[in-house]
Curated annotation (Swiss-Prot):
Family: Belongs to the DsrH/TusB family.
Main function: Part of a sulfur-relay system required for 2-thiolation of 5-methylaminomethyl-2-thiouridine (mnm(5)s(2)U) at tRNA wobble positions.
Pfam families xref list: DsrH
Organism from which the protein derives: Salmonella arizonae (strain ATCC BAA-731 / CDC346-86 / RSK2980)
The entry's keywords: Cytoplasm, tRNA processing
Name of the protein described by the UniProt record: Protein TusB
Quaternary data: Heterohexamer, formed by a dimer of trimers. The hexameric TusBCD complex contains 2 copies each of TusB, TusC and TusD. The TusBCD complex interacts with TusE.
InterPro entries for this protein: DsrEFH-like, Sulphur_relay_TusB, Sulphur_relay_TusB/DsrH
Length: 95
């Protein structure tokens, strides 16, 4: 399943998101959700042991001036790769 997070993590039920993550899922951070990808962020730390891949939209990272602060554990994707993710994961959950 592809989970998308367009909001800062404190504005959603992040513990529920963590509970619903399954092996092989992906989490795509976009809009204000890219703040989760900042190195040392407590929400990112809680994702470290999850059996998923965390992606963040490059355009939203750049728009917020966060390029140098994003963790190396997060895969940066552009809009084309975003579309590929939506095709790869038939099921999606927006937070």
């Amino acid at each position: 399943m592809l989970h998308t997070l367009p909001h800062c993590a404190s504005s959603v039920d992040f513990p529920a998101l963590l509970r619903l993550l399954k092996e092989g899922d992906a989490l795509l951070l976009l809009q204000d959700g890219v703040t989760v990808a900042i190195e040392g962020n407590r929400f990112l730390e809680s994702l470290r042991d999850a059996p998923i891949t965390v992606y963040a939209l490059k355009e939203d990272i750049d728009a917020r001036g966060l390029g140098g602060q994003i963790s190396d554990s997060v895969v940066r994707v552009d809009y084309t790769e975003f579309v590929r993710l939506t095709v790869k994961y038939a099921n999606q959950m927006a937070w």
